[in-house]
């Protein structure tokens, strides 16, 4: 048996081994920003910052999850760290969703729960917060955009279609987005998640929240991407939005990859090598958008099969590109 002295020595040695690891972990764990201080939702909604400093561009990231839950990995933390590596400050928004119990129990026939416009109010508040704290976080207020994945892409577009123009982000990045609530290609789970069981078939509400129907004049530039083989959100959603942006002469770039599926986010392993090229394409688009004097750190990634341009007008900001891989 160990003597008391030996036992104490081993405990001290163990603590000396573990504490530096815990301290390092605590230092690398991003803080959470309370954007609804003093309200009943302050513990359910927050921003997680990944700061780049140097008066950087900022992107508020809306993870997807059918308005029922969040993918805080590939569409959250990994997206934040990727943007930060490329000198873009990211703020990952955990917005209100219906959550799993509402998905399973359908209790929103009787109770309100979380539903529209809760998530939009959270995004609106996050835009206000980042702008008002721009000096503290060292971001440029003229270069604050919104990125959204899947249902988060619907939320990102809602910021320019449903908020006052004075509160619009400067650019929007919908990635494999949910777009329509009226077309046969709609993603029904996202519609139910956003509207609730008692309102998901309300025609007027569904129409007003179909992003392809309400693209505003002078809409900020949009970078739109999806995959033709998406098994979750039908690829036609993005095509509807692309057509609407084109009809409104909105400066945008649309890339549709042949393979990649859904939910790859900013992951280095999910999806396909082909679809993961969207990150490099986006960085180049953003660099051109703001005509940076300092170059973004755009790292070339593995080369996909060649893309062909289906529709292209040469000069930005009127560039409209539809890429399809062959």
Where do the language-model regions lie?
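N-terminal cap/lid segment of alpha/beta-hydrolase-fold proteins
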Residues: 27-54
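Mobile cap/lid helix-loop segments that gate and shape the active-site cleft of serine hydrolases
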Residues: 38, 177-214, 220
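Short beta-strand element of the alpha/beta-hydrolase
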Residues: 56-64
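Catalytic nucleophile-loop/oxyanion-hole region of alpha/beta-hydrolase
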Residues: 71-73, 78, 94-141, 270-275
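C-terminal catalytic histidine-bearing segment of alpha/beta-hydrolase fold enzymes
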Residues: 101, 108, 239-312, 316-317
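Primarily recognizes the serine-hydrolase "nucleophile elbow" in alpha/beta-hydrolase
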Residues: 125-189, 206
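Short beta-strand/loop motif that positions the catalytic acidic residue
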Residues: 218, 224-226, 230
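Conserved alpha/beta-hydrolase "acid-adjacent" motif
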Residues: 231-239
């Amino acid at each position: 048996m160990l003597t008391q002295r030996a036992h104490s020595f081993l405990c001290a040695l163990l603590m000396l081994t573990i504490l530096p690891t815990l301290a390092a972990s605590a230092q690398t764990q991003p803080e959470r920003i309370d954007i609804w201080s003093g309200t009943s939702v302050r513990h359910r909604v927050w921003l997680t910052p990944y700061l780049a400093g140097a008066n950087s561009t900022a992107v508020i990231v809306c993870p997807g999850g059918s308005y029922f839950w969040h993918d805080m990995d590939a569409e959250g933390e990994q997206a934040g760290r990727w943007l930060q590596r490329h000198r873009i400050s990211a703020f990952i928004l955990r917005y209100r969703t219906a959550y799993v119990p509402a998905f399973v129990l359908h209790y929103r026939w009787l109770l309100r729960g979380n539903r529209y416009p809760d998530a939009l109010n959270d995004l609106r508040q996050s835009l206000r917060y980042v702008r008002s704290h721009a000096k503290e976080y060292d971001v440029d207020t003229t270069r604050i955009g919104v990125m959204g994945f899947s249902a988060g892409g619907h939320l990102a577009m809602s910021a320019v279609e449903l908020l006052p123009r004075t509160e619009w982000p400067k650019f929007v990045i919908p990635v494999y987005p949910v777009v329509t609530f009226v077309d046969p290609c709609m993603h029904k789970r996202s519609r139910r998640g956003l509207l609730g069981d008692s309102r998901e078939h309300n025609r007027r509400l569904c129409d007003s929240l179909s992003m392809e129907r309400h693209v505003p004049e002078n809409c900020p530039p949009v970078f739109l991407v999806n995959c033709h083989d998406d098994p979750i959100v039908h690829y036609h959603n993005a095509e509807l939005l692309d057509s609407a942006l084109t009809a409104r002469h909105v400066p945008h770039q649309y890339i549709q990859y042949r393979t990649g599926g859904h939910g790859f986010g900013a992951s280095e392993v999910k999806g396909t090598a082909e679809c993961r090229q969207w990150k490099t394409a986006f960085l180049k688009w953003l660099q051109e958008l703001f005509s940076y004097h300092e170059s973004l750190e755009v790292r070339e990634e593995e080369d996909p099969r060649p893309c062909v341009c289906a529709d292209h007008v040469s000069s930005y900001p009127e560039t409209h590109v539809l890429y399809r891989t062959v």
